[in-house]
């Protein structure tokens, strides 16, 4: 899998955005889809879980899909396999975030192009926790 081309400076600018909807956030504390957003929450980010199989995670209400989130979102952080990203991107575009962040190991060129064509920046194959803690 190729590396994301964003510079360190670009990543730092993205990490200044504080409202994050986390698609695929897990209730299981052993999974990255739980402990990464938990870390971000503990470090000042406003996390909104998006998971149709949960009602509450980290004492925050979960939403079934990204467009159900009532507030504006700066970043849509995705914890789903690459082959499941396209419908998530299509839904996220409707929410008009500034950035869609595909976590480490996630890359879908077709879906990423769709987001970029809609004016949304896309980070892929990078972990927000790792980037924030550098």
Describe these PLM feature segments.
Residues 57-60, 74, 110-113, 131-134:
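Short, charged, surface-exposed secondary-structure boundary motifs
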Residues 66-104:
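Mid-chain, well-packed structural core segment of small domains
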Residues 16-19, 73:
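Phosphate-coordination loops involved in phosphoryl transfer and adenosine-cofactor binding
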Residues 21-23:
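Conserved beta-strand elements of the Class I
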């Amino acid at each position: 899998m190729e590396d994301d081309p964003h510079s360190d400076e670009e990543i730092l600018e993205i990490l200044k955005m504080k409202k994050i909807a986390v698609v695929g956030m897990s209730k299981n504390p052993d999974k990255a889809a739980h402990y990464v957003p938990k870390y971000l929450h503990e470090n000042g980010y406003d996390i909104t879980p998006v998971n149709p199989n949960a009602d509450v995670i980290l004492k925050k209400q979960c939403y079934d899909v990204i467009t159900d989130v009532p507030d504006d979102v700066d970043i849509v952080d995705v914890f789903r396999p690459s082959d499941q990203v396209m419908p998530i991107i299509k839904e996220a575009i409707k929410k008009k975030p500034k950035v869609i962040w595909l976590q480490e190991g996630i890359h879908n060129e077709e879906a990423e192009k769709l987001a970029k064509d809609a004016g949304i920046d896309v980070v892929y194959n990078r972990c927000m926790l790792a980037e924030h803690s550098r």
